[in-house]
Amino acid sequence: MVTNPGGGSTDAGGGPVRHIPVLLNEVLAALSPAPGKLILDGTFGAGGYSAAILAAGAEVIALDRDPSAIAAGQAMVAAHAGRLRLIHAQFSNLGDHAPQGGLDGVVLDIGVSSMQIDEPERGFSFQKSGPLDMRMSATGVSAADVVNRAKVADLIRIFHFLGEENQAPRIAHAIEKRREEKPFETTRDLAGLIELVTPRKMKDKIHPATRVFQALRIFVNDELGELAQALFAAERTLKPGGRLVVVTFHSLEDRIVKKFFSDRAGRATGSRHLPAAHERAATFTAIGKPMVSASEAEAEANPRARSAKLRAGLRTDAAAEAADMSLFGFPNLASLGKLGG
């Protein structure tokens, strides 16, 4: 998966680039698939990870919230004679599709997929004009709904927190003024306004609309909430010795994964001022280095790998802890809800 909403995946000749699984060797090393093991791939996409896991002899349960990914994956299902189950589902609900404490591994590749970015009609990229949609599935509010109906204060919160956009107030007020005249309908429409009110400077490496598009996509698909719930579900479904491997592409996602593994490493409750009443048993221990990033060679061959970070944990035999969303400290932006209505 990738995060750059500018999209534009082309090779040197200008043609489309085939989907290349990011950090594939590192994922396999951390996941350790083998015959007799059951691995859940929570983000099937184009099937890159699933194919490699199957090639190692393991069985795979694969999930994807995008109906087009499920349709495209049917040929792979047919080719693997009962060793691959492909299910249309969000990875936050992975516990509904796997035996409790029965998985040997879970792999999550967070963010929008290359295929989604490369399809203008999905509305993820501003490089080609398409409907302002950004939904990974066909349900829920679209990016156009948010841009055209959300209160200015809510737009500012979304752009600032989910996009880390310093110009959030200026952009939000410009959106409000423009939508009174005409609603936003296309990706180019919104990107053009953002570029007008926050023009690109010579030192800027990204398009002025990049962070706003990222924020809208994350909000529309509740990506941070989905990730947090998937981590809790993986904790419940992995057997002792099972492996959780997560690949992220921007700092907000990585912060959640890092916080989860740090919290689940086990420590005494309390502080030096208030002695702990008991030790918390670790539910995960680290696998290898705390964080792995792409090699320079991979980043050169696949620029989308440059921002990727991998974190992995080994499940202990301690009981799973409560799923407490307050652990991550981010506001419940999904509750903004009424979009000004």
UniProtKB/Swiss-Prot annotation:
Its EC number is 2.1.1.199. One of its GO terms (cellular component) is cytoplasm. It catalyses: cytidine(1402) in 16S rRNA + S-adenosyl-L-methionine = N(4)-methylcytidine(1402) in 16S rRNA + S-adenosyl-L-homocysteine + H(+). Pfam families: Methyltransf_5 (PF01795). The keyword Cytoplasm applies. Its main location: cytoplasm. GO terms for molecular function: rRNA (cytosine-N4-)-methyltransferase activity. S-adenosyl-L-methionine binds at residues 47-49, 64, 91, 109, 116. InterPro entries: RsmH, SAM-dep_MeTrfase_MraW_recog, SAM-dependent_MTases_sf. GO terms for biological process: rRNA base methylation. It is an enzyme of class 2 (transferase). Keywords: Cytoplasm, Methyltransferase, rRNA processing, S-adenosyl-L-methionine, Transferase. It is found in: Cytoplasm. NCBIfam families: 16S rRNA (cytosine(1402)-N(4))-methyltransferase RsmH. HAMAP family: 16SrRNA_methyltr_H (MF_01007). Belongs to the methyltransferase superfamily. RsmH family. Specifically methylates the N4 position of cytidine in position 1402 (C1402) of 16S rRNA. This is Ribosomal RNA small subunit methyltransferase H. It comes from Rhizobium etli (strain ATCC 51251 / DSM 11541 / JCM 21823 / NBRC 15573 / CFN 42). The gene is rsmH.
